[in-house]
Amino acid sequence: MKKKITRIAITGAMGRMGQVLIKEIQKNKNTVLTAALVKNNHPLIGQNIGEKIGIGKTSVSISSDINIEKNDFDVLIDFTKPSGTFYFLEQCYEFKKNMIIGTTGFSEKEIKTINSYAKKIALIKASNFSIGINLLYQLIQKTTKILGNTSDIDIIEYHHRNKIDIPSGTALSIGENISKVMNWELNKHSLYYTKGITKKIRETKKIGFSSIRSGNIIGKHTVLFSSSDEEIKITHSAFNRESFAKGAIEAAVWIHEKKHGLFNMNDILKDKF
């Protein structure tokens, strides 16, 4: 049976991630771009999105009004900021449209709200949509089961100078994966390195977080398991944003006909592999 085409709306269409998503949608035989959304008063509203991002003329004009586009898409993909994400989430909730959330930096209260919206629409929320990082989560879980009680654990993350949340959402997801295996509450077992002089030796049963913001680093995450005898280092590096975009688009296709619920990339990997 022929697979149903997924019609996708992209928010932040003229941003770095938005442009990569649109280019990858054009390459995917199972998807079509039907809405390219930007903020109000954007100077390119009304112009052809394809021409503006260098892929040739498309059938989609840049818009700031999701109400105009609401009948033209099945799934919305959002990689913006929490405030923008919630605006679009409320619209998707009202229109009964499914949504992919790639934004990070939500508060606990905002996460609870997202969970409540998933009772009516289908959502996939992930801090990182690359297949590689989601495989890293699985490796981390297995390593933690064996070494978690005998090692100091550290997460070191590197991103571009414009990333505003510290630590990264992916680093926190790694920490949550470790905490789940160890039966810890992450916020009670986190150690954030700052300037100063340590007054005591490092506490046990803590996950150390270090963040670097520099240049145009797409994303790199290293997890260390260090004991007095040896060290295991597990690293994932993203060379470009295409890996995130491809994963998000696969997520959109997967969630297209789901009725409701909150899902993550692990749900998709279970189906695919």
UniProtKB/Swiss-Prot annotation:
Pathway: Amino-acid biosynthesis; L-lysine biosynthesis via DAP pathway; (S)-tetrahydrodipicolinate from L-aspartate: step 4/4. (S)-2,3,4,5-tetrahydrodipicolinate binds at residues 160, 169-170. It holds the Pfam family DapB_C. It catalyses: (S)-2,3,4,5-tetrahydrodipicolinate + NAD(+) + H2O = (2S,4S)-4-hydroxy-2,3,4,5-tetrahydrodipicolinate + NADH + H(+); (S)-2,3,4,5-tetrahydrodipicolinate + NADP(+) + H2O = (2S,4S)-4-hydroxy-2,3,4,5-tetrahydrodipicolinate + NADPH + H(+). It is found in: Cytoplasm. GO terms for biological process: diaminopimelate biosynthetic process; lysine biosynthetic process via diaminopimelate. Its main location: cytoplasm. The active site is at residues 159, 163. Keywords: Amino-acid biosynthesis, Cytoplasm, Diaminopimelate biosynthesis, Lysine biosynthesis, NAD, NADP, Oxidoreductase. It is an enzyme of class 1 (oxidoreductase). It comes from the Bacteria. GO terms for molecular function: 4-hydroxy-tetrahydrodipicolinate reductase; NAD binding; NADP binding; oxidoreductase activity, acting on CH or CH2 groups, NAD or NADP as acceptor. GO terms for cellular component: cytosol. Its EC number is 1.17.1.8. NADP(+) binds at residue 39. NAD(+) binds at residues 12-17, 102-104, 126-129. PROSITE patterns: DAPB (PS01298). Catalyzes the conversion of 4-hydroxy-tetrahydrodipicolinate (HTPA) to tetrahydrodipicolinate. Belongs to the DapB family. Homotetramer. This is 4-hydroxy-tetrahydrodipicolinate reductase. It comes from Buchnera aphidicola subsp. Schizaphis graminum (strain Sg). The gene is dapB.
